[in-house]
Amino acid sequence: MRKLFGTDGIRGVANVHPMTMEIAMQVGRAIAFLVKKENYRHRIVIGKDTRLSGYMIENAIVAGICSMGVDVLLVGPLPTPGIAFITTSMRADAGVVISASHNPFQDNGIKIFFSDGFKLPDAMELKIEDLVLSQRMLALQPLAEEVGRASRIDDAKGRYIVFLKNTFPKKYTLDGFHIVIDCAHGATYGVAPHVFEELGAKVTALGIEPNGQNINAGCGALHPELMAGKVKELGADIGLAFDGDGDRLIVCDEHGVVVDGDHVMAICAKELLAQRKSKKKTLVATVMSNMGLEVAMKKMGGHLVRADVGDRYVVECMRKNGYSFGGEQSGHLVFLEHMTTGDGILAALQILAIMKKRKKTLSELAQVMQSFPQVLKNVRTAKKISVDSIVGFADAVKKYEMQLGDTGRILVRPSGTEPVIRVMVEGLDSAEINDIADELCELIRRVSNS
């Protein structure tokens, strides 16, 4: 059983186990120990978002890595995909991201990329856990003259901006586009405005004044209403909202209507199919994606494959089976042609390129898919419980699944990052699926509160 790592690295309240300085230093030691294979200077990239606790955790990880004789390259606040890019660009042995993504500023986390820019597999995370908890590394520390050094890459942001612009077709510019962006006071604040402005767009930027405590606070991908309202107010062409670490994108059309990740995937999949760039004509989504996406893919002549929730599992499925595009309803979009992980800014550029090429608004492009009614409810639990242990729960789910038939489905799963059980119900009748979700949530609450 995992003791440190969840579905997306290690995460928790800063300065509380497991997100303590002591654990962070041990994680740094473990990563350094695992990458040391040959007799040469090894290097690990470290980047972060804009949380107050990022500096504390960064220093602890740096100390751990250097104490094992490995050098550190610091890039400062940079989106998660930017850190993956710099890791591969600098031929580093690994990359470390200090971020809790869309969570409030009190939380923080540690995510790790391998030298190829992909997140560590489960087996490698378990090795790190074992090393951290066993204390075996204390006997393996090098002599004083062999400790590592930490240095800063001053132009990391600029390198990433150039990379992003190169993913946008060179025959197009964004001249004539008015774009509203919301950077959530997070890692994209110093990157996104420059990318879109340098490509010729008029940019209205929100969420670009981080103070260490305002990341994701009433803004960004979790609060697209801020971006949408500004689009309507200014008559902009599109709105783009990123989460705290920049690996997620939520968009709104020219009317201020939010377009979720499923619709964006459908838009991009259609274009990739038309260009014959969709490997095996397959889109990889997750179990959370709407049934309407499945229907849309069939109409386009493509296929939908579902992976477990989490962009890392989407990427694992893509790599294992040779697929090129995938994502999540929540806004993680992965274009393996360009990037090894979800990248909000890169995804936005691909959408804008389609709008430019097809000479259509986002609202027109979004007609490619019609969503089935879907309700998603979160039940916060006082203690960790398994739905399998709830008496009568499995029978209730089976009964409702029979009631919905082939035009609906039920998904119940625990969150990988917080004490929450998510209940998703999909079907043709909104009132019916809402009632079903309420009944299932009530069963969970009774056990949680008992």
Curated annotation (Swiss-Prot):
Q: What does this protein's record comment on cofactor binding? A: Binds 1 Mg(2+) ion per subunit.
What are the positions of the active site?
101 (phosphoserine intermediate)
Cysteine pairs bridged by disulfides in the record: none
Report the InterPro entries cross-referenced here.
Answer: A-D-PHexomutase_a/b/a-I (IPR005844), A-D-PHexomutase_a/b/a-I/II/III (IPR016055), A-D-PHexomutase_a/b/a-II (IPR005845), A-D-PHexomutase_a/b/a-III (IPR005846), A-D-PHexomutase_C (IPR005843), A-D-PHexomutase_C_sf (IPR036900), A-D-PHexomutase_CS (IPR016066), Alpha-D-phosphohexomutase_SF (IPR005841)
EC code? 5.4.2.10
Molecular-function GO term, any one:
phosphoglucosamine mutase activity
Annotated Pfam families: PGM_PMM_I, PGM_PMM_II, PGM_PMM_III, PGM_PMM_IV
Which GO terms of type biological process are on file? carbohydrate metabolic process; peptidoglycan biosynthetic process; UDP-N-acetylglucosamine biosynthetic process
**Modification after translation, per record:** Activated by phosphorylation.
**Stated role:** Catalyzes the conversion of glucosamine-6-phosphate to glucosamine-1-phosphate.
Q: What is this protein called?
A: Phosphoglucosamine mutase
Q: Provide the taxonomic classification.
A: Bacteria, Pseudomonadati, Thermodesulfobacteriota, Desulfobulbia, Desulfobulbales
Q: Which gene encodes it?
A: glmM
